[in-house]
Amino acid sequence: MPASNALGGPGRWTTLRSLFPVPFRRFPAFLRATIERHGNVFAFKLPWRSYVFINEPALIKELLVTQQHAFVKSLGTRVLRLLLGEGLLTSEDPLHRRMRRVVQPAFHRERIAEYARVMERDGADFAARLHPDEAFDAHAAMTELTLRIATETLFGSDESDSAGTVADALRLMMTEFPAMLTPIGALRQRLPLRNTRRFWRARSTLDTIIYSLIARRRRDGSDRGDALSMLLASEDAGDQQIRDEIMTLFMAGHETTANALTWAIYLLAQHPQVDERAASAARSGDREYVARVVKEVLRLYPPAWIIGRESVRDVTLSDGSRIASGTTVFASPLMLHRRADLFPEPDRFDPDRWLGPEPPPFAYVPFGGGARRCIGEEFALAETAIVLQALLRRYRFERAPGRVEIAPLVTLRPAGPVRVIARTR
């Protein structure tokens, strides 16, 4: 079957010009422009690979659920194993299914209710330490806070002394990651380039911290009911596998929430009416409005901004689109969530849109979907809402001078500092 022969799309050189020289950073703009010209399902090629992009909820459901067995994780996710190893985000079945069963109890609702006490305490402590009327980088602050919460709740450890080191190492590795997706990425991994050396040093730093944590907990021997206790008790997980799962949870367990909180602060600083309602809700205990704020933040800035799969056999989708074996298929919640026919006035920050009818299934997928849906979704939603309420009870935020842009890397993080000023209410 010729690759995607039923689909239109941009020519090879148009694609190259659009994505050169930094494909990942330019990918959202390329997708927006191509959707406008070719619609919500199209094919495109680069010299080394054929691609299909789907932006229809029903087809995304096929990709992630009804025809999931025709696909494996994409090349980008496989390259991500350099950072995370064979953790939940990167592994395939049966390993993924087995390890998900091991870790899943740590994310049950009763456990999250216990974690909420840590989230509330640490969120309130951060709010109390914040200096009013001084500009600060919201993303750096939220990264440090959420990393502390993740280590306390998921790993039963206070790694506050090394929180900055861990955050810096993760940031460096994720910044270097897109370069490894290029055709010369495999070669870059082996050359003694400065950026490559920095990547491997950062990984070594994280490995040292994680293996030390594993050793301490093995010596301790107690079952604390957290994710690390479950991994240590599993007969299926040696230290290497535990390291891979911890690395994945380190990244996903704080990065997702740090980004969500940063984008929430950024949006509320620009929408004072929403901010006032959210603050009033936080003070009165109205969790429903705060939940809608969080839901709307994740619509505009979904953590799983790009989803990639590779077909392992020829596939025909329900709309007749034909996908040849070996084709990379992308879906993008970042594009999907801004479709005007699904979300009227899609660029408007409007938490009350969630009072109306729910969008169609798989039209709103900030954490992905199907069997690979983010295991920590409920954890992230709870943490974002709890910390945001702690901040809103005391402060309103104003933007400080500086440009804010997205960095579409492993997650949808800011490209640089998000400078804001906290004003006492």
Report residues per predicted region:
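Cytochrome P450 heme-thiolate monooxygenase catalytic core
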Residues: M1-L7, F71-L80, S91, L95-R98, ...
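N-terminal membrane-proximal hinge/A-helix region immediately C-terminal to the signal-anchor transmembrane segment
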Residues: M1-R98, R117-D125, S160-D161, R197, ...
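Cytochrome P450 I-helix active-site segment
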Residues: L7-R12, A116, E120, D168-L172, ...
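Conserved cytochrome P450 K-helix E-x-x-R motif and the immediately C-terminal K′/meander segment
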Residues: F20-G39, T208, S212, S284-D319, ...
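Short, conserved phosphate/pyrophosphate- and ester-handling motifs at nucleotide-, phospho-/glycolipid
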Residues: E56, G253, G326
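Cytochrome P450 heme-thiolate "Cys pocket" and heme-binding signature region
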Residues: A252, W354-V387, V404-A415
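Cytochrome P450 catalytic-core helices
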Residues: T256-A281, E377-Y395
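Conserved cytochrome P450 K-helix/beta-meander segment immediately N-terminal to the heme-binding cysteine loop
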Residues: D314, A331-P357
